[in-house]
Amino acid sequence: MKAENEQRTGLLYGFGAYGMWGLVPLFWPLLKPSGAVEILAHRMVWSLAVVGLALLALRRWGWIRELLRNPRKLGLTALAASVISVNWGLYIWSVNNEHVVEASLGYFINPLVSIAIGVLVLGERLRRAQWVAVGLSFVAVLVLAIGYGRPPWISLVLAFSFATYGLIKKKLNMGGLESLAAETAVLFLPALGYVLWLGAQGQSTFAAHGVGHALLLAATGLVTAIPLVFFGMAAIRVPLSTLGLLQYMAPVFQFGLGVLYFHEAMPPERWAGFSLVWAALVILTWDALRTARRSRARLEAAAPTVLATPAREPA
């Protein structure tokens, strides 16, 4: 009963995390007339403030000494910070420049790009269904490129930057709050310097558009940290396969907002490209669930054998 309650709580946290990530396109336009770079700089500054307070409340500081003593981890943290800043900055720009649908595509194809990176960088071997999914996504990009009259570069940069970020995070092996604190700390001084420089040049929007605008810019820290905390609470309570399915909530919400709320154009060739991506994701999800089910069945079949084997006395 307790396990069921924990899993139910984890699902609620998961829905909360991916729901907030899916609805975040509604937030960034509220920060206009701030530009994408100014918003990104404030996001870095205020995220560190929020996460720093959270870590202070939780008394989780031991990791800092270990990180500072490990040059390799420091380098990977700096690299992760650079990659995620590209991802965040481009996403903010795309939402505020009427490219919400194309941005959502980036997060739809992100699992497929992660698989491709696994093959190219880590030498992983794909199952047949995974090859089919990757092939379909490649055809989808070609169809969308024809439809847009250009490669869907926003989608590709978002997908590859986030997949690269995931690869670096895998090597870092740090908790969500800790890694966010470390990454924003790396970029804190440049971000703060840029905010102060804008103020000195008379180009800052922070104090020029009233208290409400200043509070919204400061809220970028909460918008960044709260979904991450919810995701962390979900990750320890629900199976990874469930999280894998929940991750599609965010781009589904973003796509829906782009079409229904922001009224972005969806000509037939764009529908065709997205349909190919969705077909690839259905195949990928089916294959992942089938593989997980088979692995679980093998473990259950092996368990009685292990239990039935008599223990040998030490020689």
Curated annotation (Swiss-Prot):
This is Protein RarD. The gene is rarD. It is found in: Cell membrane. Its main location: membrane. It comes from Streptomyces exfoliatus. Keywords: Cell membrane, Membrane, Transmembrane, Transmembrane helix, Transport. GO terms for cellular component: plasma membrane. The chain crosses the membrane at residues 11-31, 37-57, 75-95, 103-123, 129-149, 180-200, 216-236, 242-262, 271-291. It comes from the Bacteria.
